[in-house]
Amino acid sequence: EANCAEYPETGHPPMTIPEWKEMLLKYRSYGINFVRFHSHCEPEAAFAAADELGMLLQPELSHWDPKDAFGTEESYRYYRAELVDLLKTYANHPSFVMLTLGNELQAQDEGRERMRELVRTAKRMDPTRLYANGSNAFYGEEGCDPESDFYTSQSCKDVVIRGTFSGMRGYLNENYPSADRTYDEAMAEIRKEYQKPVFSFEVGQFEVLPDFEELESFHGISDPVNLKLIKKRVEERGLLPT
């Protein structure tokens, strides 16, 4: 996941193919072949580089965690125009394989219908790709959307498909680490009502102690206040590695 288009040195994403090839090759070195652009769409150089390297990309509309997604006519028109432009702009890139309407969207009745209509619009324009109403839409509480081509979430209603949650919940926090935990039972339950691809959402969200030496790497426009605060608290508790 390329989280939130955060580029601390420049404040904007790389704009050239060589820069993107360098970044994507780093992903590949970690065994990654699929990149989700969290609530944003990167510039065309990203898609061109991914085409050359055989990487797969999932852009998203720039919509994140509202309580009433697409609830107004103005927002619906705006995001529909964004969707149409995105599909027209990137349609010829084979690396562009999936798309969602945004991150952790929630909506009221009218917004829900507009979410369905946006997915239908995308399918009509270009049926060669996979579309979904969101990544972790409704935080998984409403289950799989039957009109979406795939489902990405932390859970499907009360069926958990992620190892850790906020508040120190999840089996990674509650049980001794082991490699014998699978999601077979969870998927068997989901398959009773949904047969399309299922992805677990943001599985790497667990607490680790930061590498505070990275503070010396910030030379651009960003001030890593969060890391500085964490370091201060770690020092106060006598936990700073020596």
Predicted regions, residues:
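Polar, glycine-rich mid-to-C-terminal structural blocks
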Residues: 111-187
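Active-site flanking residues adjacent to catalytic metal/cofactor-binding acidic residues
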Residues: 59, 103, 201
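Conserved, mostly hydrophobic/aromatic
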Residues: 50, 99, 122, 131, ...
